[in-house]
């Protein structure tokens, strides 16, 4: 049987780059970055591939026998399912645990004996909820499917003998909200990696959305376009990976797969020097803009006029000014669309020298650059700007007028293309003869290259990206995750899939807005016969562009409801994917051995929890909206509906976890307290149920190709989140229902601390916020409970019965389990002392002993000194 590695795509890109970067199975160690970047291991032949078997042999055999004579498109991806030797025990364990849970519920209700009946009632309700939420999480995982793009087949089909391409157009969206919280250098590296991707330059365009309206981002984009004339041909000539210069130049010993090794050293040195100068220019932009503006403002004739911010061409910037005034401040400014790089002329433009004047030999290298556009949508206090969804919809409309590509892929500004073949990999799913026409979007896993080696706060989230998402791939497809996702433009427009689509669809102004050019572009998109084309430059077109990105264009249209990205919910990604799936579209999950995209994640605990609050709060908002999975999505498959329901209610679980986690305070009660009697049988039931869930987890680990550390980090951070971020989100939702105020959107800061010598300085900085109070209470309660338990043991060991000793042992076991789960939080409290984790290992037993001694001393004091 062929392994996934032996059948993945191969071939060369348009500049002769080898197939070393072709997509295979995703590697467990491929979230890499900087000097610590590791080679992607695993792949199809590793531990991850051996549990998967080809699922499309019959289809491939039929396609091969047909030889393409039926005129249909070829098979462009391969499907794999978990082998029966692993899948059948996995399913059996799920059913067995379900039966065990039901028996446990029945037993608890029949034996409603407890020392604290209100707590017994709450614990039973919690157990029922745990079982229900576990079932919602587990049912969609019955049929995991891995889909691998076949780049060789795509090249044979789309790369024609005359040098032209059959590839469709792609518009790439990059969104940034603030140049301070999201550093400009990150954003420009994202743009450079997009411009250098292996895709025909005349069929791709890049749009940067700047939600701050700041001149610095526009001028940084202009500088980036200049540097791209050197960087992009350099990447093509030498097959550079990754194509983000910051990430590439951090590599200690990058492997070389190009065809000109004798020129590489000199070329790399020159480009590196140019990149350093490019960074200096970016860093100097704020001061450059300020000095220029001061010069122009000093020459104004009306001294009472406000101090404007001036562009390099001597005109006033229409966006946010350094000294903000009405109509020129963040949150209130005109819409801006500026074409930084126009559409390249068709045909190969070969050059011996790059435009910067450096003597680099780019002979036989295509030096053209894709279209590059700056977009800053208009904002007005009288209109809701709808956060990221509003910015994406403005890009969607502007791109419709400029390039109107059939497919769209969006990135957060802190991500970059790690594998230049990524666009082609996604296109494999869109053009495949089986599901291509019904595929609305292709989601890639999120990978991060700035996470600490031990992944203290579970940023990699492998359980979700390598487990849950593959499971959804076997249903109607993965959910949209906000970045690294390719969309079919028609699906974003709210058009039904071909099977349900009506003939002769007429775009209406009431739905898409009052723009004739936009309505015409929708008709062209329906014909699916247009890719990126040169943009018109007449005044009418410019006015139309400014109108479609204005603050009021969405008003009284279907934008944000049935068209584009959905508004009024903090997690616009999940609800947008839900709306598209609900129309009958499917989605696909694309993994590549050398990860398609990499980004940065918040490694500071507080920043990470703020991110979780927004995600979980948005999920609850979705449940209490008309997009509730119980009532919405008329064409959702049943298990896909179950999956979305789980995504919207999971934060509620935290309330019962918090109840259990704080229950050890009962150790402080002098008398014995039993939650459930008979206690021994209760504990046995719990142990069996917990053991079974970890056996299921062990099988998931095997077919998902992750490690026990990945699994354990997921468990730990879920516990931290369940005592902090998730209850906060539930509280926000209650406030929202009472006051109609939504979840506040807080941009996750990507800035590191001033300690530039420590890559993980943010990891060791503790920023106290109110949501951490419950977690601290739980930690202190369990530390105190363990100490008191030790003290009680010392006092009562001689008189305790065996049952009492067993009760104490089980209580201690629970306390220690909670402590292990909160271990990352304890490290966070230690700050920089956490660099030596042995300190915590030594400190905790000392604290336990101190608490025990205090308890013993108090007991002696109360028993022998203070009379009653």
From Swiss-Prot:
Which UniProt keywords are present, listed alphabetically?
Answer: Cell wall biogenesis/degradation, Glycosyltransferase, Golgi apparatus, Membrane, Transferase, Transmembrane, Transmembrane helix
* Disulfide feature: none
- UniProt-annotated stretches for the region Disordered: 36-68
Where on this chain does substrate bind? Answer: 412, 414
A Gene Ontology cellular component where this protein is annotated is: Golgi membrane
Membrane topology term reads: Multi-pass membrane protein
For this protein, the record's InterPro entries field holds:
Cellulose_synth (IPR005150), Nucleotide-diphossugar_trans (IPR029044)
* Transmembrane domains' residue ranges: 86-106, 116-136, 649-669, 686-706, 717-737, 771-791, 810-830, 838-858
Cite the active-site annotation.
Answer: 211, 573
Give GO terms for biological process: cell wall organization; cellulose biosynthetic process; plant-type primary cell wall biogenesis
| Enzyme Commission designation | 2.4.1.-
Q: Where in the cell is it found?
A: Golgi apparatus membrane
List all Basic and acidic residues biased stretches: 53-68
Q: What is its main location?
A: Golgi
Which GO terms fall under molecular function for this chain's record? cellulose synthase (UDP-forming) activity
- The answer to whether the entry has keyword Membrane is yes
Cite the PANTHER family for this sequence.
X-BOX TRANSCRIPTION FACTOR-RELATED (PTHR13301)
**Function in brief:** May catalyze both beta-1,3 and beta-1,4 glycosidic linkage on beta-D-glucan. Essential for (1,3;1,4)-beta-D-glucans synthesis in grasses and cereals (Poaceae). The mixed-linked glucans (which are not present in walls of dicotyledons or most other monocotyledonous plants) are particularly important constituents of the walls of the starchy endosperm and aleurone cells of cereal grains such as oats, wheat, rice and barley. They can account for up to 70% by weight of the wall.
Tell me the protein family, please. Belongs to the glycosyltransferase 2 family. Plant cellulose synthase-like F subfamily.
Entry protein name: Probable mixed-linked glucan synthase 3
| Species this chain originates from | Oryza sativa subsp. japonica
Taxonomic placement:
Eukaryota, Viridiplantae, Streptophyta, Embryophyta, Tracheophyta
